[in-house]
Amino acid sequence: MSKHTVLFELGCEELPPKSLKTLRDALQAETVKGLNEAGLDFASVEAYAAPRRLALKIVDVDAAQADTQKRFDGPAVQAAYDAEGKPTKALEGFMRGQGITVDQLSTFQAGKVEKVCYLKDVKGQSLDALLPQILQTALDNLPIAKRMRSAASRTEFVRPVKWVVLLKDDQVIEATIQDHKAGNVTYGHRFHAPEAVTLAHANDYLAALEKAYVVANFEKRQATIQEQVKKLADEVNATAIVPADLLDEVTSLVEWPVALRATFEERYLAVPQEALITTMQDNQKYFCLINAEGKLQPYFITVSNIESKDSTQIIEGNEKVVRPRLSDAEFFFLQDQKQPLASRKEKLANMVFQAQLGTLWDKSTRIAKLAVALSSITGANPADAEKAALLAKCDLTSELVGEFPELQGIAGTYYARIEGENTEVSEALGEQYLPKFAGDVLPKTKTGTTIALADRLDTLVGIFGIGQAPTGSKDPFALRRSAIGILRLIIENELDVTIEELVNLALQGYGDIVKDHDKTRADAVAFLEGRYRAKYEDQGVAVDVLQAVQALAPKSPLDFDKRVNAVNHFRTLPEAAALAAANKRVANILAKEAAPEGSVIEANLVEDAEKALFAELQAVTPVVEPLLAAKDYTAALSKLAALRAPIDAFFDGVMVMADDADLKANRLRLLAQLRNLFTAVADVSVLQG
């Protein structure tokens, strides 16, 4: 069967930049799905996207579906013919329905019954006939929240459609898609090459558009932007901040990217750089530049969609646009400094945290008391922790945070520095919200760690205390994410504390506000322990490793983490699979018949294999016990791995359930001793493979 290259392009008005990549990928996926469902084989489907177009190139696609046979089932052979071999009424009805004669019948075996059938030859449809509907269906299935149409069109799309290209090699496939007749004419850059571009062949698409100042390949356009931005940054010994989302959005805004470096007045560098970066990235789509120390430089890079003969005008235009925004940030920053942070508590007293849990000032005072209590665990200075907690939410009343909500905490740090607070206090104000997401950095200061813990614990315990724990997809206070943050703060700072101890400390701040302390404690502890799985799955830890540790229900997150790491390492040992299987066998035996109380009686060991296992246990136990006491679980399991050979020999040569009651009891005690050594770390019997 012959193969062809197909080009499809949908031209339209400017597509939403934040959706362009998603639309491209969805169009590709839906088209692949349609081709597969139609039984059309192909080598690849390449997808392209630019501000005014979505396109696909289908490589080496079949010219048509393969011819097939469709089977229509009739009556059983026994019921199809009478004693004389003539068709019965049942068979005649079947033939009449299919419009066939006896000589066109076949038979097939349906289980034990032979049946009559008609095998109808079905000629495969051509690519030309199938493709228009495949593409239209793909367009209809795109994830578009709100569709629109132009006045002359009956069909809807995310933006009004202007033209459609559908080429099979060098031939136009006759089709009407999105109310537009397909052709071989596309259009170049709106300003540099607005005239029509006739495509002679599907393979000419990318090159023809590049001549018309359009880079249709999204990744190529993006790489060009990255190269240009890096070059401009290097010229001033700086590094560009290039967030992935911003890069995607800028790539979606231009057909012919031209990066230009502009400047702003150095006086604005006195403003918190986070505010300047936010306004330049979010509002202007600029790439900001920083030096080797991470300090903002008085430059920014804009990406133009025009290759201008005089780029100075474009640069000056952008500098003129950004100046008022930077001035606004400067104004807010200076205005806020007229009111010290500590004096803002009155405004916090009028800001509701949660109707039943009080105002933000109520929360601040609870956090302060909790932070003092936590200081003995985190090693923070109690006075610093208390002061930082009382100042922590004050910047929420500032004009800078009002304009840039993402600066909460960060603004507080700047104001605290200006007011002369020490580093522990000032840095803690910004660190209180860390970690913000999975993989985010943690606070660097002990005070920051303390406030971050106190804030999260206060919210979690309070919300559970009023019966508003997360349910299903509802988690308005982001407690699931917050819980993982609590676990990380404990584990990565190596805080030796149990979850219940922390919850109890947080409960003390609520007094009578929380009516049922026992239920709240139990629910909050269970919730935090239930977040281990999400935390470790993000790190790639297997579920059975978690199950092995959870079987012991460790109370301390730090202890839990050490056990997880130990079991993870244990799984890499060559003895692991055999020892896991042996432990499972031991667990099953002891589940059916528990070991009698008492120690193993050496005189009752009669088989060489059980004597050898006992000797190994006696030798390894005094080595392992100090490791367990020191919580060096990785080393403990590594030592226990040496028991593989004597355990295997034991099960190969010893009958545990002996007829002699004393021998059986002794062997059960031996297995219990073995089991207890392993379960001092984790239940490795649940490990798979």
UniProtKB/Swiss-Prot annotation:
Cited PROSITE patterns: AA_TRNA_LIGASE_II_GLYAB
KW Nucleotide-binding (keyword) present: yes
Gene Ontology biological-process entries: arginyl-tRNA aminoacylation; glycyl-tRNA aminoacylation
Disulfide bonds: none
UniProt cross-references to InterPro entries, sorted A to Z: DALR_anticod-bd, Gly-tRNA-synth_bsu, Gly-tRNA-synth_heterodimer
Keywords: Aminoacyl-tRNA synthetase, ATP-binding, Cytoplasm, Ligase, Nucleotide-binding, Protein biosynthesis
Catalysis: reaction(s): tRNA(Gly) + glycine + ATP = glycyl-tRNA(Gly) + AMP + diphosphate
Top-tier EC class: ligase
CC terms in the record's Gene Ontology section: cytosol
Places the protein is found: Cytoplasm
Record GO terms (molecular function): arginine-tRNA ligase activity; ATP binding; glycine-tRNA ligase activity
E.C. no: 6.1.1.14
Cytoplasm recorded as keyword: yes
Primary localization: cytoplasm
Family membership noted in the UniProt record: Belongs to the class-II aminoacyl-tRNA synthetase family.
Subunit organization: Tetramer of two alpha and two beta subunits.
HAMAP family in alphabetical order: Gly_tRNA_synth_beta
Family matches, as NCBIfam families: glyS
Listed name of the protein: Glycine--tRNA ligase beta subunit
Gene assigned in the entry: glyS
